[in-house]
């Protein structure tokens, strides 16, 4: 089924107008438009209390602040609020403050929207420091849990290796940022997580290892039922695929298996429980953004999918948005989706680090 492609807003320039949005497939009644363009390498997003949209980047080294200066509901002001950073992919907003994750640290910009309004040079403090400096899988997705703690992943610095912690973990920081506990271990590279709105449990995606073939291993959707659980890396992948280098003598029963095997090399990024009211009930489930494969003979991913849950069991996993990948032609792609950010009206923003835009996905009715 195909939804609608809506006209772009005032913040959209010629580059976005050239994107083939008509190639995107959405369920009937849904629409997609470019919300903000010219945000190269757009990654994680966070929304301020006054409506400022903060966007981190990876290779660009910048953080953007996007605002609606005239109150018409359309972004029209873009500011590069930080530059020259080391892969500032992750951003999170809490109680007026913006948190920006680089590879080895997390900055805190107190009262950020007031700072931006003042026009003065932005001040910040280091909230977290001293994390590993390895760049491979070192970029971060960060977020605050319902417990008020900041969760920060530290990816494995390799395709496959057995390095000491905090590598291959998700860390939960104390409220002052000075200490942490290992909340999940055996996590190769998570770039997205969210908390179940009912149970409060952390669900996260994990990117599987490479160089084992086109079909092995599958990437994972996982659920943390007890702090400190081990999810298998580097000994097992997708629950039961024994690693040829590190799996000998290990028992898969000693590790937590995934809730869902997502597919080989699909590269899951954001995991988002939809809690808005504007989508029909059939679409108020768990959305997973698949960034797309890079080392598979036929590409896979490059889409947003929806996992339908019954309790903690996934009973269906189906496409929600696809069309960025031209599988039927030359296996080329024109976009790679990354992160989802809900808006107050129930629509979802979706960043794209390849096209350098942020889309808005909304339900407009049948």
Predicted features, each with a name:
Residues 41, 49, 77, 84-87, ...:
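Beta-rich catalytic cores
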Residues 92, 104-145, 153-156, 184:
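Asp-box/WD-like beta-propeller blade repeats and closely related beta-sheet repeat scaffolds
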């Amino acid at each position: 089924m195909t939804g609608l492609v809506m006209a772009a807003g005032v913040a959209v320039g010629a580059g976005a107008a050239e994107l083939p949005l008509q190639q995107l497939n959405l369920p009937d009644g849904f629409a997609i438009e470019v919300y903000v363009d010219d945000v190269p390498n757009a990654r994680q997003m966070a929304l301020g209390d006054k409506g400022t949209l903060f966007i981190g980047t990876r290779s660009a080294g910048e953080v953007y602040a996007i605002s609606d200066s005239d109150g018409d509901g359309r972004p029209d002001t873009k500011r590069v609020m930080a530059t020259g950073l080391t892969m500032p992919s992750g951003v999170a907003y809490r109680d007026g403050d913006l948190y920006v994750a680089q590879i080895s640290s997390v900055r805190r910009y107190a009262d950020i929207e007031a700072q931006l309004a003042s026009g003065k040079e932005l001040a910040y403090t280091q909230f977290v420091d001293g994390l590993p400096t390895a760049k491979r899988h070192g970029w971060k997705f960060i977020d605050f849990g319902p417990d008020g703690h900041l969760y920060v992943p530290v990816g494995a610095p390799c395709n496959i290796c057995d390095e000491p912690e905090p590598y291959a973990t998700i860390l939960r920081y104390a409220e002052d940022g000075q200490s942490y506990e290992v909340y999940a271990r055996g996590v190769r590279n998570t770039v997205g997580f969210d908390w179940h709105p009912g149970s409060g449990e952390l669900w996260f995606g994990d990117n599987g290892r490479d160089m084992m073939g086109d079909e092995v291993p599958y990437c994972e959707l996982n659920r943390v039922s007890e702090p400190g659980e081990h999810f298998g890396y580097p000994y097992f992948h997708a629950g039961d695929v024994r690693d040829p280098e590190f799996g000998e003598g290990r028992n898969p029963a000693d590790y937590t298996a995934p809730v869902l095997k997502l597919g080989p090399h699909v590269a899951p990024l954001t995991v988002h429980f939809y809690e808005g009211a504007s989508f029909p009930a059939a679409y108020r489930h768990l959305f997973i953004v698949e960034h797309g494969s890079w080392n598979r003979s036929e590409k896979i991913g490059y889409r947003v999918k929806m996992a339908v849950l019954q309790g903690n069991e996934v009973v269906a996993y189906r496409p929600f948005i696809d069309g960025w990948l031209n599988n039927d032609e030359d296996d080329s792609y024109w976009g790679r989706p990354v992160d989802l950010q809900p808006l107050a009206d129930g629509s979802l923003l979706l960043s794209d680090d390849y096209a350098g835009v942020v889309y808005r996905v909304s339900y407009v009715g049948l």
